[in-house]
From Swiss-Prot:
PROSITE patterns: RWD, UPF0029. This is Protein IMPACT. The keyword Repressor applies. It comes from Danio rerio (Zebrafish). It is found in: Cytoplasm. Interacts with GCN1; prevents the interaction of GCN1 with EIF2AK4/GCN2 and inhibits EIF2AK4/GCN2 kinase activity. Interaction with RPL39; this interaction occurs in a GCN1-independent manner. Associates with ribosomes; this interaction occurs in a GCN1-independent manner. Associates with actin; this interaction occurs in a GCN1-independent manner. Its main location: cytoplasm. The gene is impact. GO terms for biological process: cellular response to amino acid starvation; GCN2-mediated signaling; intracellular signal transduction; negative regulation of transcription by RNA polymerase II; neuron projection extension; positive regulation of neuron differentiation; regulation of cytoplasmic translational initiation in response to stress; regulation of translational initiation. Residues 296-317 are annotated as: Disordered. Keywords: Cytoplasm, Differentiation, Neurogenesis, Repressor, Stress response, Translation regulation.
Length: 317
């Protein structure tokens, strides 16, 4: 028993020393997600072309480094197919060649080397969001939508709304309580918005936060009402979590909330949640909408049967 405890203590000490070294070497690129659960991430970019970027999320098991590898996930929407397999194989080869040793620095530099090679042989990453960490879902139905015309974000539709000036004040961003299930964590963020430029400003501000930027997925949806045109501009983003953006937007439609952006960050913990992940995403969103006065309680909204007679912007206090 004492030997086992000594073994665990030695591993923990090695982990602490390795994390301290990586934090010192990489500075702001290194991010602690959950120190107690030993979850970390690092954002790795090609020096000359920062558009080539990968986020490496790492979970350190108790037996690392002596007898178990780190649990890792590579987050990059553009990295797919053979390229993803090649990079994963390279990381696994490093572990095999250095079994029992601390290898995170070697992994980071291998990824950086991979990005450098990619940048020299390609114009730029394909940012099509097709990478999934879980089994795919189905797009939401389009029933129960408000009886007004709907506009998708485009250069034409954006002109309907008053553009935000460059010196316009950044909308206030609210952060909700996190939900954790099987090592995956979900956290909602909300902001009142009146035009697409404000949406982008809020997203940019959120992504300045290292922890949010390193999330496996940042799913968002927004709805903006234009009274003159009796139209709603709305859009959503899965960020690789297939169908999640559409489901989140559908929730906003059912509640008929307007002039609001909701973002849900998910940090994937290595265990598949199946359909539960959609439940957590929408529960996070609903909770912060209720908290900020955009929606009624769950009991009241369920009585409405998905048909909201009065569109809801934020309620005055």
């Amino acid at each position: 028993m004492d030997k086992l405890e000594d073994h665990d203590d030695n591993n923990l000490q090695s982990q602490i020393e390795e994390i301290e070294a990586l934090s010192s070497i990489y500075g702001e690129e290194w991010c602690v997600i959950d120190e107690a659960a030993r979850v970390f991430c690092i954002r790795i970019s090609e020096t000359q072309q920062p558009k080539w970027t990968v986020c490496l999320q790492i979970i350190l098991p108790p037996d690392y480094p002596s007898s178990a590898p780190p649990i890792y996930q590579i987050n990059a929407a553009w990295l797919r197919g053979q390229d993803r397999m090649t990079l994963s194989n390279s990381l696994e080869e490093i572990y095999v060649e250095n079994a029992g040793e601390s290898i995170l620095y070697l992994w980071v530099e291998k990824i950086r080397e991979f990005l450098t090679e990619k940048s020299q042989h390609s114009d730029g990453p394909d940012t099509c969001k097709t990478v999934m960490t879980e089994e795919g879902g189905h797009d939401c139905d389009e029933d129960d939508l408000p009886d007004i015309s709907v506009l998708k974000l485009s250069s034409q539709s954006e002109q309907i709304f008053s553009p935000a000036s460059d010196d316009e004040e950044l909308p206030l961003i609210k952060h909700g309580e996190s939900i954790t299930d099987r090592r995956s964590t979900f956290q909602p963020h909300l902001s009142a918005v009146e035009n697409p430029k404000q949406v982008q400003r809020v997203l940019n501000k959120l992504y300045e936060n290292k922890k949010i930027a390193s999330a496996t997925h940042n799913i968002y949806a927004y709805r903006i009402y234009c009274q003159e045109k009796n139209s709603v501009l709305q859009d959503c983003e899965d960020d690789g979590e297939t169908a999640a953006g559409g489901r989140l937007l559908h929730l906003l439609q059912i509640l008929d909330v307007r002039n609001v952006l909701v973002v849900v960050s998910r940090w994937y913990g290595g265990i598949l949640l199946g359909p539960d992940r959609f439940k957590h995403i929408n529960n996070c969103a609903r909770t912060i909408l209720i908290q900020e006065g955009y929606a009624d309680s769950t009991e009241e909204t369920s009585k409405a049967g998905g048909k909201s007679k009065k569109p809801k912007s934020k309620k005055t206090k």
